[in-house]
UniProtKB/Swiss-Prot annotation:
Misc. remarks from the entry: Was identified as a high-confidence drug target.
GO biological process entries: regulation of DNA-templated transcription
Protein name (record): Transcriptional regulatory protein KdpE
Knockout consequences: Cells lacking KdpD and KdpE show an increase in virulence in mouse model of infection, with significantly shorter survival times.
DNA-binding region boundaries: 127-226
Upper lineage: Bacteria, Bacillati, Actinomycetota, Actinomycetes, Mycobacteriales
Function: Member of the two-component regulatory system KdpD/KdpE involved in the regulation of the kdp operon. Upon phosphorylation by KdpD, functions as a transcription regulator by direct binding to promoter regions of target genes to positively regulate their expression.
Amino acid sequence: MTLVLVIDDEPQILRALRINLTVRGYQVITASTGAGALRAAAEHPPDVVILDLGLPDMSGIDVLGGLRGWLTAPVIVLSARTDSSDKVQALDAGADDYVTKPFGMDEFLARLRAAVRRNTAAAELEQPVIETDSFTVDLAGKKVIKDGAEVHLTPTEWGMLEMLARNRGKLVGRGELLKEVWGPAYATETHYLRVYLAQLRRKLEDDPSHPKHLLTESGMGYRFEA
């Protein structure tokens, strides 16, 4: 269950958000002061934070700075301040979104869902171990395991696999891949890619002639699918 920390000194805002979030399956904790918010976050690290800037004991920007020292969860600022400078300051301090009061609940909840999705996707992409049904890529250990044994890869093969794996599910252009693995001087040497991808498929795919994980996007580049 997604844990939401709501920080606001207006009781009616706290109540409205608690009710609307709870009925949609979120777990909610609230705080009406900056000090209380930092204490609550330390005791129960939230998955997402909703933060008002106008708190009675300290600036919401200071609260944001305190949270950003250790918390990577998305922070949505909810404030009556409409000046562009306030928005810029909050976003520069680490806020992920800025919603002005008064606000529509449906739009706000949509922004909340989007922030949670982005954070979840980013966390998944940062996972150091990627498992497929054919092999496992350990990005931190810089190795690949297949059928219980480590697969020997050359530094170039590993460089190509690593870049594709770190961008899994996304198209990686041929020029981008060449510059990253071989260097800018090789940006047009596309035949290198065909040779090394074929080698990777032979070593990793169960059926190299019908690959499931190391895919070619004709004329564009390559994609890794777990």
